[in-house]
Amino acid sequence: MSTFERNSSAPPELDDIGVNLPAPADFSTALAEGFARRIGTLARRGGASGEAVKWAARAAFAASRATAEGHVCLPLAVLARRFDASSAEVRAALFASGMASDGSQSAAALRPLVVDGQGRLYLARYYDYERRLARSLVAHAGVNAGASAGVDADATAQTLHERLLRYFGPQQDDEVDWQRVAAVMALSGRLTIVSGGPGTGKTTTVVGVLACLLDARADLRIALAAPTGKAAQRMQEALLARAGDLPPELAARLPQTSYTLHRLLGSGPGARFRHHRDNPLPYDVVVIDEASMIDVAMAAHLLDAIAPQTRLVMLGDKDQLAAVEAGAVFAELSARPAFTENGLQRIAEALGIEAARLSEALPDASGGFDEGPDDFFAQTGAPDDFDTPLDDVFDDADAHGAFGGLPGDDLFTGTTVPVAEIGRAHV
């Protein structure tokens, strides 16, 4: 049973088809009721049958409430069970109402509700956010996405190893150093997700990565950002505090300010951000802290604004500070990763350890994490078998190749990453 099914009141019927609505318990419920009435009215005006109108209203209420609770979508089966109906019956009624699309249409052509091929019910806006995000992730992490600032595709494992020694120091013990693993991946890919709890060294890792990049290219344009002003300030202070360990000439090149995501993207009086696909951010490297707070809408806008050649590093704790709005994007993207033999070998060579040793310390594909990676782990890109509506997008875009990770290597298999809906509805 889903969280939505346990916690939500049953979708109401419309007053004007003979069923009284309960008094709204809160604003989101009132909003859902108003939306349900509107969808029912539009369906009836369009000539839909009474049964189709009723299901359109029920679905509108359920989708709106799910979004208010942080879910991007919910299984149609959840709604069907409430009224002892089958998913097939509900799907047919929704399409007959004229208020639902199957998701194959362009954003402008979507109806208010979307029922995808896997039986998930969306508000059209959130379906489009998720679809845009999926396509942007595939395009940005793709090995053929074009030259990437600071991505040293021709760097040998020895070069990477020397840079790690220079800016991370020598290996301290026999344990796998996950900061170094994260650094190798961040130095070798356009999209890197770094998840770890407080004190696991995310900031130290970023400082080292930026030092390695600036050492290779002194004129890199770097931006630091976070979802809130307080988080952005903390990130800036932590980075500058650790910059004292760097050579002065490198420390001086680190960014001296940070931004909120809205300021970074250029929020203004209009509905659209100033930076988007047609006017991308003018940076070579963008580092986002507290990324677990980013919802699916902001993630879609952010990826739209990242130029193909720009490196994006996202830091956060997948177990804390969930997004306020719908879509726990960071938690989904930092789910259990898996690596191919080529990828393991390249990372191991850069670290100066045996590939077998690294492999043994990696997350257990059957479900759990070993102690080390659970505390600190990084991955590039995202898997190709998102068990979600993103699945079709990734399949169409050849995501297995797109998320090869390190240039020239099939680093990230993605075949053992059971990522559920982008959102908190894991059913």
Each predicted region: which residue ranges?
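Conserved ATP-binding/catalytic motifs of P-loop helicase motor domains
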Residues: 2-426
